[in-house]
Every structure is written in structure tokens, then in C-alpha cells.
Amino acid sequence: MELTGKKLEEVLNAELVGKDVGYQNWKLHWKFTNALLSVIRIFAKRAGLDENAFSYKDQGQSSAYLTYRGVVFGDASFQKQRGERHYGSYDWTFKKIFVNLVNEDGCSSYNGLTFQEMLDRIDEELSAKKSREEAKLEQAKQIFQKIKAELGNVSDYDVVNYIKYMNDNRYSLYK
């Protein structure tokens, strides 16, 4: 199943029409956010993606950020309209919330990528980040062993304290 705005709208029509997802009380925004997340997960599952990889980061009463594997990829802000909080109808929900995620052509309105391309890019970034972190960890292990060898017969605890002391006193152990 191709991931496009039209397909997403079909899912929204099937899952949300006639259901209560719009309201005026911001204290109930969890209900609204969960409805949006449910639709994303339904959409993801139908597209053969891991539905549990999708979540959101709640940013208080005004917005929630949709996430994929913990990475923010869409802003689902509950935007203000005419100075008042406006949650609106299903149509407003699709147009205002999901336009930041995918537009009618299946491309993100802010970076021109399709929904799938956005997820692929996140996967690539996470993989690259993991590689960088593994390289840093290996470098740190080598530095630790080098310092331990230079200090002689000392415990790992003493080496850690030595490193803390050097860093606290603005010596760079990485030069």
C-alpha cells in the first residue's frame, strides 16, 4: 500500500467519521491526540509498517509531536484560531494536523519527502547515530585502558575519578 495523503484520508474517513474527536476543552486533549495516533497506527499497519514504532511526545496543552522510533517527524500542533483554541471538526483535523505530515500528493509539506521517505531517512539517521555512538564508545574504552595502563595498578573506580578530575580541571583527554 503506497503511503499517500489520499490513502491516509481514506483511513481517516473509515475510522473517524461520526466519532467524537473534536472538542473545546484543552484538558481533554489526550483523547484527541490518542485518536490521531490511533489513525497513524492503523495507517501504518495497513502499509505493513510496525505500528508500535509510532508514538507522540506531548508538549503540554498546546501541541503534541508525532514520533517514529522516538524521532519527531511531524508537528500535530493544536493551533489557535482567532485567539481561541480551536479543535474543530474531522475535516479541520485532517487538513490542519496531517498537512504537516503528508499532503494530497503524499509529500511532506515542509520537506518534499513522501511519508515512506521520511521514515527511511529517520532509519538512516538512527543507524548513522548508532554507528557514531559505537565509535565514540570504542574510543572512550581505548582512552580508559590507556589511562589505566599509565596510572599503573589502580582500580576502574580510581580511573573514573582521575578522568573526572582532569575534565573538571579543563584538561582535554581527547587531544
Regions found by a protein language model. Name each.
Residues 170-175:
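Short acidic DE-rich linear segments
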Residues 14, 35, 44-47, 53, ...:
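A sequence-composition feature that detects small, non-aromatic residues
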